[in-house]
Amino acid sequence: SAYREAMDALEELSKNFSGNKEEVKPFHVTLSDILRQYNSRMQQSNMMTKTTGELLLCFKEKNLGADTLSAIAEVLRKNDAVKFAKFIPLQTESKNTWEQMKNILSSLQQFYQTPKSQV
């Protein structure tokens, strides 16, 4: 399933991350890519080339809960800061971002599994 693949990718990413400075950027880029790939599969639409703003609009249109939407925005913006603004978070911050992504994927999976008549 898309969810299992995303969770496996997260686990693999965590196992291979030692916190070295040169690993930080690829780590955060991959976190965003995992979310994009998962959402692409669930939506059957390519989300890989969407900007963070476009991706957030897509999530907003889904009527996700405010907490989930806020968490997604926070994680994507932090990952963008690492990717584009040369922000180097502490290893603990990177691990926290990883945990947030894991929680986001769980929330999204519950959202996608809820019959639409209940939404």
Question: PLM features: residue spans?
Answer:
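Cytoplasmic C-terminal tails of single-pass
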Residues: 1-14
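Membrane-proximal, non-transmembrane interaction modules
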Residues: 11-119
